[in-house]
């Protein structure tokens, strides 16, 4: 498996995706399901495929993905990041184009923690003068 598969790990919010690519017909499997069945929204599928469209490798690779944690949007972002890293592992000359598009950089935005005395992260408790 090590010789023919290239891999990459992607992260976004609280989601982690392990991506394995090999030469094939363009079949994408997420957690043993087809990508259409796993992601309900078309925008999530588009986000996942962005690195492949950018590098013109849509029908070149079979992709196997294991993803856990977070919601649909975070998982789609993690898959995109993982596919990008796997493509760079396959061919390092793709890195400048992927980096220019902003796919190589890990999106570091996380949920801000709830503070003591507040209702949420920044929303304060209602104040009453009387």
Curated annotation (Swiss-Prot):
Q: Which UniProt key words apply to this protein? A: Ribonucleoprotein, Ribosomal protein
GO cellular component, as recorded: cytosolic small ribosomal subunit
Q: SUPFAM superfamilies, from UniProt?
A: Ribosomal protein S5 domain 2-like
Q: Name one GO molecular function term.
A: structural constituent of ribosome
Tell me which Gene3D superfamilies the record gives: 3.30.230.10
GO BP annotations listed: translation
User: Entry's InterPro entries?
Assistant: Ribosomal_Su5_D2-typ_SF, Ribosomal_uS9, Ribosomal_uS9_bac/plastid, Ribosomal_uS9_CS, Ribsml_uS5_D2-typ_fold_subgr
User: Which family, according to the similarity comment?
Assistant: Belongs to the universal ribosomal protein uS9 family.
Task: List the protein's name.
Answer: Small ribosomal subunit protein uS9
What organism is this sequence from?
Answer: Polaromonas naphthalenivorans (strain CJ2)
The gene coding this protein: rpsI
